[in-house]
Amino acid sequence: MIEKLNAIGISDAMITSTVITAIICVLAIIAGRRIEMIPSGFQNMIELGIEKLHGFFEGIMGKYACDKYFPLIATLFIYILFCNYSGLIPLAGEAPGFQAPTSNVNFPAGMAIIVFFAVQIIGLAEHRGIRFYKHLFKPVAFIFPLMVIEEFVRPISLTFRLYGNIYGEEAVINSFFDILPLGLPIIMQALSVLMGLIQALVFSLLAAIYISEAAEHEEQLPVTEHM
C-alpha cells in the first residue's frame, strides 16, 4: 500500500502529515464536546496553556494583531509541534510511510509559503489595497529592490531553519539508537523534546512578527524591528 502511494508521488512525509492532521482534528472535536462553563482538570490545563501562549504572542504582536490573528499563529505552532514530535518516535524516517514531515524540505517550504501569502493577504486587507506596499519604499525609495528581496528571503529562511534543525536531529537520534547503549539515546530524546518545542516556537514567532508588521498601521507604533 505504502509503495503504491509512493509510486504516485505521495511521500512518507505527506502520509505522516495527513495522519497528524487527522489526529489533531479528532482531538479538537473530542475537546470541543467536553467544554464546561467552569473548567476543571484537562480543560483547565489546556485553557491555561492557550492563555499563556496568547499572552506571549500579544507581547510580540500587540493586542490588536494578536487578538485578530492568534488562531492562525496558534494553529501553526500546534501543527508544527506535532510534526516535530513525530520524529521522536523510533524508526521515524526508516519505517515505510513514516517520516517526520518537518524533516522533509517540502513540508517546511509549504508552511513558509502559507506564511508568505498570509502576510500579503493580511497586509492588503489591513491597508485596503496596494497602499500596503508603500513600506517597500521606506525610508528611501532607492532601497526598494532590497526590500523586495527581503520579502522573498523570509520564506526561504523559515524553510531551511526548520528543515535543517529537525532533519539533523532525526538523523543523529537514529544513529545513536543504532550504535550506542540505551541510556544515551533516551537522554538525547529528552533534549529533542525541548528542541522540537523551540523550533515550533521560533517558526510561529517569526510568522507572528511578519504578520504583525503587515497588520501595523502608520498611526501605530512599531511592534518590532525587521528580522
Could you say what each language-model-derived stretch is?
Residues M1-M227:
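Selective transmembrane helix interface/packing segments
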